[in-house]
């Protein structure tokens, strides 16, 4: 019998429900239970693919090409697993299916309503995934009281009724503010939030109280009394230095043990040794390197969440802390490359459109000419080709046709299969594709194999007509698409310390104990470069 743990949020959004859900998943998996995580996003978009990163943070891409909420990235990293597009349930998907069924006449003339038709479809989607697992953690996005999340909370309430109380638990994440004026933690927002949840027919089994400092005993007692939750199940989730500490904190607070007991499961000793080792290693790092990320969404660093995490993973494997210098690409256009002075490594990440493109090209030139360890990703890969064409091959005005359709040298062009599309949603080259790696190259040294699967999200590619000219000038295409030999995937400059760019997004497959090879290589090169600089000064 599958067990379900629903995670809801109250008071304010952005409390870390995603990290809490991922941590619960990890604590169950560490006990030997086959566990997975589902994210419910109550917005009406079908998926996260066409959303602005400023509003929503990064769009995370799965193996099957699903463009999903960044929380699924956290689930994959914490549980070291690969999820599917079905693990992200949105209002858009649910309504689409119900309307299609209604058009096909599957409801036999019934009046189609939120209850039972929408709620049944939500439950069907959750159960569909649950079939292969012992425990399913379901995070319901948004805040209790939001009009959008009502049908999902109702479906969760019904599931507890249908599956039996012993098979469904509710964890409510709330915020306990501390008012500086009075210097005490305030539990009233939590009380009201739980009251709201109970008015919808849901009694939480555990409360994860987010606060800056550990929860005071008085506050814990008060929350327990007013929310009808046992004291042992009022969990203090105070701020920690790093999100990877959260599972260990929740375990120390007794959440794993409590949930297993609440669901009538055998409480096995959780095996968190590897995780503890990784966290201890990360916290103990003394030396640091500084890596610049030059992008167009740096005002909201969550737009590059997986890159931040991949650098963290690589910092553990290289035993050196990575400090990130965030630089707006347009600032480079305005103030020049002096903004990059002193960095030990440079990343130009993905991103669409003309804004900041010239700043990124200036950055790539600076990295190449000054031999600074460099990694270009997706659009960063394409602009590396543009920079090389302009400044090494002398192709004045070379560009990507995405930015300049009239360029005399279209060194980056729309992929042939992308030419006549009228829809933007879900139509790119998305998901995991095979990449063949040439032996004797930096890429082969990093991956140590000649065939890898990496995740993609792009419409443009290196124009095959120019490949020969690039190669003659010393640019090495060390990775090509396994499904189309004319499609370039990895480029490198062998005469540089570390200069590599990928058409795919290596950050999406990076894991705490298995850093993405190109990130590991970048941090290693940055560390060596810094040591060289320090030795000469």
From Swiss-Prot:
Residues in Glutamine amidotransferase type-1 domain copies: 290-532
Top-level enzyme category: ligase
Keywords attached to this entry: ATP-binding, Glutamine amidotransferase, Ligase, Magnesium, Metal-binding, Nucleotide-binding, Pyrimidine biosynthesis
Catalytic activity annotation: UTP + L-glutamine + ATP + H2O = CTP + L-glutamate + ADP + phosphate + 2 H(+); L-glutamine + H2O = L-glutamate + NH4(+); UTP + NH4(+) + ATP = CTP + ADP + phosphate + 2 H(+)
Region ranges (Amidoligase domain): 1-265
CDD domains linked to this entry: CTPS_N, GATase1_CTP_Synthase
Residues involved in CTP binding: 13, 146-148, 186-191, 222
Top-level lineage group: Archaea
Activity regulation, short description: Allosterically activated by GTP, when glutamine is the substrate; GTP has no effect on the reaction when ammonia is the substrate. The allosteric effector GTP functions by stabilizing the protein conformation that binds the tetrahedral intermediate(s) formed during glutamine hydrolysis. Inhibited by the product CTP, via allosteric rather than competitive inhibition.
Binding site for UTP: 13, 186-191, 222
Molecular function terms from GO: ATP binding; CTP synthase activity; glutaminase activity; identical protein binding; metal ion binding
Active site: residue positions: 378 (nucleophile), 505, 507
GO terms classed as biological process: 'de novo' CTP biosynthetic process; pyrimidine nucleobase biosynthetic process
Protein role: Catalyzes the ATP-dependent amination of UTP to CTP with either L-glutamine or ammonia as the source of nitrogen. Regulates intracellular CTP levels through interactions with the four ribonucleotide triphosphates.
Further remarks about this protein from its record: CTPSs have evolved a hybrid strategy for distinguishing between UTP and CTP. The overlapping regions of the product feedback inhibitory and substrate sites recognize a common feature in both compounds, the triphosphate moiety. To differentiate isosteric substrate and product pyrimidine rings, an additional pocket far from the expected kinase/ligase catalytic site, specifically recognizes the cytosine and ribose portions of the product inhibitor.
Subunit structure: Homotetramer.
Name of the featured protein: CTP synthase
Organism: Pyrococcus abyssi (strain GE5 / Orsay)
């Amino acid at each position: 019998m599958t067990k379900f743990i629903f995670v809801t949020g109250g008071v304010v959004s952005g409390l870390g429900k995603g990290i809490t859900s991922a941590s619960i998943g990890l604590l169950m998996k560490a006990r030997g239970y086959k566990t997975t995580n589902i994210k419910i996003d109550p917005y009406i978009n079908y998926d996260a693919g066409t959303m602005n990163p400023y509003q929503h943070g990064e769009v995370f891409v799965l193996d099957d090409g699903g463009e999903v909420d960044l929380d699924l990235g956290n689930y994959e990293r914490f549980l070291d697993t690969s999820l599917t597009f079905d693990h992200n349930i949105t209002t858009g998907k649910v309504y689409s299916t119900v309307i299609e069924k209604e058009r096909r006449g599957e409801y036999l003339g019934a009046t189609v309503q939120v209850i039972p038709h929408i709620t049944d479809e939500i439950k069907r989607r959750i159960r569909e995934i649950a079939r292969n697992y012992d425990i399913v953690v379901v995070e319901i996005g948004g805040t209790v009281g939001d009009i959008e999340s009502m049908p999902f909370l109702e479906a969760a309430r019904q599931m507890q009724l249908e599956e039996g109380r012993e098979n469904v638990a509710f964890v409510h994440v709330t915020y306990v503010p501390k008012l500086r004026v009075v210097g005490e933690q305030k539990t009233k927002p939590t009380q009201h939030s739980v009251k709201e949840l109970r008015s919808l027919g849901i009694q939480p089994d555990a409360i994860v109280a987010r606060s800056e400092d550990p929860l005071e005993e008085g506050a814990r007692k008060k929350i327990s009394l007013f929310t009808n939750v046992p004291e042992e199940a009022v969990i203090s989730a105070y701020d920690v230095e790093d999100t990877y500490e959260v599972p260990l904190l929740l375990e120390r607070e007794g959440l794993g043990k409590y949930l297993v007991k609440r669901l009538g499961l055998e409480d096995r000793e959780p095996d968190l040794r590897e995780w503890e080792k990784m966290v201890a290693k990360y916290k103990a790092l003394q030396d640091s390197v500084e890596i610049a990320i030059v992008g167009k969404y740096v005002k909201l660093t969550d737009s590059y969440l997986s890159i931040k995490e991949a650098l963290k993973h690589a910092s553990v494997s290289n035993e050196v802390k990575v400090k990130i210098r965030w630089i707006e690409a347009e600032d480079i256009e305005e103030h020049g490359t002096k903004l990059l002075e002193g960095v030990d490594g440079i990343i130009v990440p993905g991103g669409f459109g003309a804004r900041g493109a010239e700043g990124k090209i200036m950055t790539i030139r600076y990295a190449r000419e000054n031999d600074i360890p460099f990694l270009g990703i997706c659009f960063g890969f394409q602009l590396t080709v543009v920079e090389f064409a302009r400044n090494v091959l002398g192709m004045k005005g070379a560009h990507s046709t995405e930015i300049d359709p009239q360029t005399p040298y279209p060194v980056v062009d729309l992929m042939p299969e992308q030419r006549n599309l009228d829809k933007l949603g879900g139509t790119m080259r998305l998901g995991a594709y095979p990449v063949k790696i040439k032996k004797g190259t930096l890429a082969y040294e990093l991956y140590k194999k000649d065939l890898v699967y990496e995740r993609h999200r792009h419409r443009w590619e290196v124009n095959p007509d120019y490949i020969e000219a690039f190669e003659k000038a010393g640019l090495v295409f060390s990775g090509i698409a396994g499904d189309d030999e004319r499609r370039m995937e990895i480029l490198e400059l062998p005469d540089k310390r570390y200069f590599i760019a990928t058409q795919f997004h290596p950050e999406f497959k990076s894991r705490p104990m298995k850093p993405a090879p190109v990130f590991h290589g970048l941090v290693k090169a940055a560390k060596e470069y810094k040591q060289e600089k320090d030795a000469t000064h």
